[in-house]
């Protein structure tokens, strides 16, 4: 439909010009107007995705996460946009050192992509490398908790284990 061409043209116009050169006030005003227009409802995923890219490039990570999730909730069926949202969220969590969460988002990305594509192989390799990081991070966290218990005084250690036993009994 012609509306689809208009939306994609407006969305990609900012991508091509580069978000760094964009006047943020005018950009946000324009995008909010596009988001509020009822005729654009079938394209909310693309609009939220591009708004998330804008926030991501401008280091507003919290806003970027919200917009990526809004794009995912729009559910319009554009597989590549869905995969791109998951991949970008995975990269955000990876950069925040939240490797387990990043792994989950990479898994969701792989589900959306065709297995014979270059992007699929790249993300699959990245995900496999992340498995070792997640494994060693779990070991380090467990060892840190053991060391912290060992560093407690006898009184604190007894109180800690009594509290833990009560917690297990409740379950």
Task: Identify the function of each model-found stretch.
Residues 1-171:
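Acidic, polar-rich low-complexity tracts and alpha-helical solenoid repeat scaffolds
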């Amino acid at each position: 439909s012609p509306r689809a061409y208009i939306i994609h043209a407006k969305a990609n116009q900012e991508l091509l010009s580069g978000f760094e050169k964009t006047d943020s006030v005018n950009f946000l005003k324009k995008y909010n107007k596009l988001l509020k227009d009822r005729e654009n409802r079938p394209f909310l995923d693309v609009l939220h995705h591009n708004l998330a890219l804008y926030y991501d490039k401008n280091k507003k990570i919290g806003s970027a996460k919200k917009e990526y999730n809004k794009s995912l909730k729009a559910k319009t069926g554009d597989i590549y946009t869905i995969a791109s949202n998951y991949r970008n969220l995975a990269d955000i969590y990876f950069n925040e050192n939240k490797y387990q969460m990043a792994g989950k988002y990479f898994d969701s990305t792989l589900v959306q992509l065709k297995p014979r594509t270059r992007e699929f192989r790249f993300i699959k390799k990245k995900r496999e490398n992340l498995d070792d990081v997640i494994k060693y991070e779990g070991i380090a966290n467990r060892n840190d908790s053991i060391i912290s218990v060992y560093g407690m005084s006898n009184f604190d250690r007894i109180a800690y284990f009594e509290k833990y036993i009560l917690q297990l009994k409740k379950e």
